[in-house]
C-alpha cells in the first residue's frame, strides 16, 4: 500500500518502483518505527485526535507487531511495501482496521524516518561502545601478560628503539579510548528527537514535543523543524567515528601481520583466526587481520559517499537522503565486526619472547642510549649524535652490536667514553631510562596498565 496515491492517475512503473523502494534495507528500522509509532499515538491522545481507548488498541496491536518483527525480522522482506513506514502502517491496519489510518495524523515520513534512524543509531552506539571497551580490555590483558617481552620499536619500518609488547598494546588502548570518547561525544548530539517536526514546517497539532522526546528516551527535542528533517549530521559523525577507528584497527592489523610474518616472527596467531592455502600445505595465513585491514577501505568509502550525497542538497527532505542508510548500516556493521574480530585475534596470540629479544638486540636500537650517555658526559647532543653515527658505522664494519665493540674502538670516537658505557647499552637500561610519563620503562608500563584497568572496570 502506497502512502501517497491520491494525487496520481497512473500506477508507478514497475522498474521505478523497484528503483524507488527502500524496504530491502530500511526493514532494519522496523523496531524503531514501531516504538516511534507507539509514542506518537500517545501524543495524539493529548491533542484529542485519539481517545485513550483507541490509543490502547493501537498500542496493543503495535506491540504484537513488534513481537512478530523481533521473532522474524526477515519476514518483512516478503512484502512489496515501499518502505518500512508503509509496511508498519499496512500491518497495523490489518490488525485494527480503519483505526490504523488515524495514526499518521500530524506526522510526516520526513520526521518519522529521521526519528527511526536516530533511535537505531543510539542503539548501535551503545553496542559499539561496549565492543570498543571489550577490545581495550583484551589489549590490557595481553599487555599485562607481556610486560617483560622486549621487542624492537620501529620507525620507517626500521628498528629504532627497544619497547615491550605491553607498551605496543597500550598504544592501541589509547587509540581506542579516543574512539570511545568520540562515540560518547556523538551520542550527545544524537540524543535529540525530531519527531513532531512534520514534513518541514512543524506539526499543526500542539503536541508537547519535549514530553514526546522523553517517551522515546531522547534527552530533548529539536529546536527547528526545518533543520530536524534536513539533519543527517549524526550519520556523518558516526561514519567519521567509524572511519577513524577503522584506521586504528587497520594499523593494529598491519602491525600484527608483520609481527606474525616469517621475517619478524614475534607472534604466532591462533589457528582459530587463520586459514590455509589450497596449494601450499605449509601456509598459515593471517586472514582475520587482512580482512580487518581490507574492510577499512569500505568504511572510508561510506563516509566519502555520504559527504558527497549531502553536499549539494537544499534544506528539508530530498529523496537523495534515502542513500543515508545502506552505507551507514554496512559501515557500522563492519566496524562492530572488526572490533569483535580484533579481540578474538588477541585471545590466543602467542608472543615469542626469545625472538622478540633477539630482534631488539639487533639493528643498533641502543644507539640513542649511547648518544644520551655522551650528553651526560658533557658532549652537546648534536655532536654526540654524529659521534654515535660514526660508531655505528664501525660496528657494522666489524659485524658487531655496539655493546660488543672494544672500549678502545669506542674511545676513537670520543675520549669521554669509559667502561661504564656498557651497562648503559643493555636492553634493560634502554627501557629503564624511559621513565617519564607515557614511557616504556617497566614502572611506567605497569602504572599505565593499572590506570587502564581502573578506567575500564
UniProtKB/Swiss-Prot annotation:
BP-aspect Gene Ontology terms: arginine biosynthetic process via ornithine; L-arginine biosynthetic process
InterPro entries assigned to the protein according to its UniProt record, in alphabetical order: Arg_succ_lyase_C, Argininosuccinate_lyase, Fumarase/histidase_N, Fumarate_lyase_CS, Fumarate_lyase_fam, Fumarate_lyase_N, L-Aspartase-like
Signal peptide segment: none
Subcellular localization: Cytoplasm
GO molecular function: argininosuccinate lyase activity
Transmembrane segment boundaries: none
Keyword Metal-binding recorded: no
Top-level taxon of origin: Bacteria
CC annotations in GO: cytosol
Catalytic activity line of the entry: 2-(N(omega)-L-arginino)succinate = fumarate + L-arginine
Pathway annotation: Amino-acid biosynthesis; L-arginine biosynthesis; L-arginine from L-ornithine and carbamoyl phosphate: step 3/3
HAMAP family documented for this protein: Arg_succ_lyase
Protein name: Argininosuccinate lyase
Source organism of the structure: Cronobacter sakazakii (strain ATCC BAA-894)
Amino acid at each position: 500500500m502506497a502512502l501517497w496515491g491520491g494525487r496520481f492517475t497512473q500506477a508507478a512503473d514497475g522498474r521505478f518502483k523497484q528503483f524507488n523502494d527502500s524496504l530491502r534495507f530500511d526493514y532494519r528500522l522496523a523496531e524503531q518505527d514501531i516504538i516511534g509509532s507507539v509514542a506518537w499515538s500517545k501524543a495524539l491522545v493529548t491533542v484529542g485526535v485519539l481517545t485513550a481507548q483507541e490509543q490502547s488498541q493501537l498500542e496493543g496491536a503495535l506491540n504484537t507487531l513488534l513481537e512478530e518483527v523481533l521473532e522474524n525480522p526477515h519476514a518483512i522482506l516478503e512484502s512489496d511495501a515501499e518502505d518500512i513506514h508503509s509496511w508498519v502502517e499496512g500491518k497495523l491496519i490489518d490488525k485494527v482496521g480503519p483505526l490504523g489510518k488515524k495514526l499518521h495524523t500530524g506526522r510526516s515520513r520526513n520526521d518519522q524516518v529521521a526519528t527511526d534512524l536516530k533511535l537505531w543509531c543510539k542503539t548501535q552506539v551503545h553496542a559499539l561502545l561496549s565492543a570498543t571497551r571489550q577490545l581495550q580490555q583484551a589489549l590490557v590483558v595481553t599487555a599485562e601478560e607481556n610486560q617483560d617481552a622486549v621487542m624492537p620499536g620501529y620507525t620507517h619500518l626500521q628498528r629504532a628503539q627497544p619497547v615491550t609488547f605491553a607498551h605496543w598494546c597500550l598504544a592501541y588502548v589509547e587509540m581506542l579510548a579516543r574512539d570511545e570518547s568520540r562515540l560518547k561525544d556523538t551520542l550527545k548530539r544524537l540524543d535529540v528527537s525530531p519527531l513532531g517536526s512534520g514534513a518541514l514546517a512543524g506539526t499543526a497539532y500542539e503536541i508537547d514535543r519535549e514530553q514526546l522526546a522523553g517517551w522515546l528516551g531522547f534527552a530533548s527535542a529539536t529546536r527547528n523543524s526545518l533543520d530536524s528533517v534536513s539533519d543527517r549530521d549524526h550519520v556523518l559523525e558516526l561514519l567519521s567515528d567509524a572511519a577513524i577507528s577503522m584506521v586504528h584497527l587497520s594499523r593494529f592489523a598491519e602491525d600484527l601481520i608483520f609481527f606474525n610474518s616469517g621475517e619478524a616472527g614475534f607472534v604466532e596467531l591462533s589457528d582459530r583466526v587463520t586459514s590455509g592455502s589450497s596449494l601450499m600445505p605449509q601456509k598459515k595465513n593471517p586472514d582475520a587481520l587482512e580482512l580487518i585491514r581490507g574492510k577499512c577501505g569500505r568504511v572510508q568509502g561510506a563516509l566519502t559517499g555520504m559527504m558527497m550525497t549531502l553536499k549539494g542538497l537544499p534544506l528539508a527532505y530530498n529523496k537523495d537522503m534515502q542513500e543515508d542508510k545502506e552505507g551507514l548500516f554496512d559501515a557500522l556493521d563492519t566496524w562492530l565486526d572488526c572490533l569483535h574480530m580484533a579481540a578474538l585475534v588477541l585471545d590466543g596470540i602467542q608472543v615469542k619472547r626469545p625472538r622478540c629479544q633477539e630482534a631488539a638486540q639487533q639493528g643498533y636500537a641502543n644507539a640513542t642510549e649511547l648518544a644520551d650517555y655522551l650528553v651526560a658526559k658533557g658532549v652537546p647532543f648534536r655532536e654526540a649524535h654524529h659521534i654515535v653515527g660514526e660508531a655505528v658505522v664501525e660496528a657494522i664494519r666489524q659485524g658487531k652490536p655496539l655493546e660488543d665493540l672494544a672500549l678502545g674502538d669506542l674511545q676513537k670516537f670520543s675520549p669521554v667514553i669509559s667502561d661504564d658505557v656498557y651497562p648503559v647499552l643493555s636492553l634493560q637500561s634502554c627501557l629503564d631510562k624511559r621513565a617519564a610519563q607515557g614511557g616504556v620503562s617497566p614502572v611506567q608500563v605497569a602504572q599505565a596498565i593499572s590506570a587502564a584497568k581502573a578506567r575500564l572496570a
